[in-house]
Amino acid sequence: MRGAAFAPPWRSAPGQSLGFTKPQSTRRAHPIESDTVRRMRASPAEYLRLDLRAHDLLRDVPLYDVSIVDLPGGGAGRSIADIRALESAAAPSGVANTIYGLRRFLGRVFGWDHVSIRPEDSRLSRLSERDRRDSEITPGTPVGSFLLLYQFPGEALSETRNATVHGYVCTALAPTASGYRLYWGIYVIPVSWLTRPYLIAIEPFRRILYPAMLRRIRRAWLAAYGATA
């Protein structure tokens, strides 16, 4: 998945905190912008009601944020593999590429990305034989700066680790009355003193990248399948 550096957002689950409160912006949001952001955020309760393997595998990892996008139509049998194909085919905007490039540059300068996942810290070793057998992609396959743990038809889980965070991204696709809903769940484990300032620093960029990414997927979905397919 693109954007690994910006995947960990800041929103702790009830009773879970890294010891600080996310600063509140004093800027008055434009009504359209505000509505877009609101519609792309899901309550943790809605996400946690889904029947996902990630809930058990990451039961001791804080869930920090859930983003959603509704995908109308699509027909029967759409899967995470379709979402990955659409995401790969839809090129990020110039702004997104600039932000990704800035993060890669800072990672090289400060050595953030020289830290790799130790086998004993990865959830890869916790996968069951059934997980490994049912995964459509070999568990442990590198995908950009992530390690793919599994990909099922309705769910995929990826893991990343650097000097700033140990994070997980769960993508889930659930059928709805009008099509499908894509969920993008983010989990974060603090790894050092850098985690806290890093998460604060990337929050403005994340507010740009996440909605843009989900809108890009939705446009690609509509182009591929149409709203009434």
Across the structure, where does each feature detected by a protein language model lie?
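Short acidic, glycine/tyrosine-flanked loop/strand segments centered on an H-E-D-like triad
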Residues: 172-194
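Short, highly charged C-terminal tails/helix-capping segments
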Residues: 218-229
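Hydrophobic ligand-binding cavity/cleft-lining segments
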Residues: 33-132
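A short acidic/glycine-rich loop-to-helix N-cap element
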Residues: 188-209
